[in-house]
Amino acid sequence: MAHTSVASLVVVLIVAFLTPILLHRFKLSIPVVVAEIIMGLIIGKSGLNLVVEGDTWLQTLSMLGFIFLMFLSGLEIDFSSFEKGKKKQFLPNGKEAPNTFAAASVIFVGIFILSLLLSYGFVLAGFIQNAFLMTLIISTISLGVVVPTLKEERIMNSNIGQIILLVAVIADLATMILLAVFSSLYGEDSGNMWLLMILFAAGVVLYFFGRVFKHRSFVQSMSKGTIQIGTRAIFTLIIVLVALSESLGAENILGAFLAGVLVSLLSPNKELVQQLDSFGYGFLIPIFFVMVGVKLDIWTLFQDKTILIMIPLLLLALLVSKIIPVMYLKKWYDNRTIFASGFLLTSTLSLVIAAATIGQQLHVISTNMSGALILVAVIASIFTPICFKKLYKREEQPEEKKTITFIGANQMTLPVTLELPEEEYDVRVVHVYQENAEEKLSESVFAVETISDYEHETLESLGIFETDILVVATGNEDMNADIALLAKDKGTERVIASVGSPEHEAALKEQGISIFSILLSTKTLLRALIEAPGVMKLLTNQESSLYQINMENSKYDGVILREFPLTGDVIFVRIFRGVDSIVPHGDTRLKLGDRLIVTGSRGYVTDLKKTLEG
């Protein structure tokens, strides 16, 4: 019988509130979600038994927390990481770095094959009857543990960091899809697996719908104040896909995960992602994890000798299934790095809980077995990040240059190429020259690459769009707009185009393309010289100009400026946070994702950039 008293909810919320405070007070370096499960053990069946398990409030909020956790798991998948392995890189030891996607794919295939073999071992030993479910449990990897650990160690953008991240991303995607297949095969509506295609088709339609409307001006204007249309759209998407997945006989968490993947593909702004994280990890998800601990009865588990024997064996299987495939990296990395990577990839939590819960609901495994699997996941998530930090020795990475490509060599672009600092940028200039201009080109001080034409096929075959920044500045405005839109469609992160007409300007801005023109630049410069000559002096001063730094180091998240360890003559001029522009003062707190406008000597600014961008 369901209870509607809020007393149990109050207990759970107080515990969820106190958990991170206690972790901080006692300086315990374990994931907060693991600590929440442990606190649930203390107040639940295994401990003080303060929570009524059948409480309606808790059941509803816990289920919503589970759904939102799966949504955020999908949202955590950074699809741009699949593109980061194309450029040739060199490791600190001088070896050429492996292609991150290829290496991650090989490692995951190894993990999956080994997990399958180990699963059959558990079946033959009589611990479990379903090898499919056990394969998913052994092969899964927790993005929720991997991503914060990589960020904390500031190796997210390194070659090894990207490989670890990609393995976790591929494992997350593959496990979730296979979990949906498992649910369809062993559920009440088994044999209707083709219905899942309807869910994925709906996801594709919703993705293109979102892509069309994302940059519309009315959407931008409705994303502020009390409307927050972006947040409303995301919650609507979650509920629609959850309802659709349930109506098709699939698990509701598949719909939530798909919603997260779709939002991630649409590249939401960081401010919106932070809002969703704050809501999820600040309210619903802690309730879910505390309730996971509340429902676990470890004393009953420990009375089962089979479970007691299986727990250490499963922990060993988790380690073996990750460390052996990671040995593939031995030709590039030392043993400490390989073992550290294997330990971090062993961390597993949310999808194990999902798999165990679904397995129990489908009567594939018992309640005790479900509890044992969750307990193993908790233990693994406690010690594996600690082992990673102990084993991994961070080597200084060579400063990675940004690549910038100019299409069009003219009086605007060529002087800029000489002024960009060589230690920060690899510059490439391409241009279509007339035959009678070849001699002048050979005598020029500028390094310009001659191409036959600006056709789409030509530009793509030359790898023009595989650059960090693309500046399109040919003499033809229509061509500039066309190439800029193509580049954005091909995935170029930053595109700058030279256009002057209002029609082109509006269309390009909707796609997130920066624009410039001689007329606009001249008007802006003249107005600045008239109204604020001091600002123009600051902008054009080579020694102390304005610089943008992206705040990406979680170590300084929440630090107030007066306590920030500034060096030299660096001054914070402005902070851009989402759509807000903040005038900084001593009590201003830095936040992840901030774009900082600073001024000062180049050397000190470079040091600050290394500190905050890692």
Swiss-Prot record:
Where's the RCK C-terminal domain? 533-614
Gene behind this chain? Answer: cpaA
A Gene Ontology molecular function term for this protein is: monoatomic cation transmembrane transporter activity
Q: Transmembrane segments in this chain: where?
A: 3-23, 32-52, 57-77, 107-127, 130-150, 163-183, 193-213, 225-244, 248-267, 282-302, 307-327, 338-358, 368-388
* Keyword field contains Transmembrane helix: yes
Q: Which GO terms describe its biological process?
A: potassium ion transport; proton transmembrane transport
Please report the name of this protein according to its UniProt entry: Putative Na(+)/H(+) antiporter YjbQ
UniProt domain RCK N-terminal: residue ranges:
401-519
Instruction: Name its cellular compartments.
Output: Cell membrane
| Family membership | Belongs to the monovalent cation:proton antiporter 2 (CPA2) transporter (TC 2.A.37) family.
Q: What is its main location?
A: membrane
Q: Which organism is it from?
A: Bacillus subtilis (strain 168)
Q: Supply the InterPro entries for this chain.
A: Cation/H_exchanger_TM, Na+/solute_symporter_sf, NAD(P)-bd_dom_sf, RCK_C, RCK_C_sf, RCK_N
| UniProtKB keywords | Antiport, Cell membrane, Ion transport, Membrane, Transmembrane, Transmembrane helix, Transport
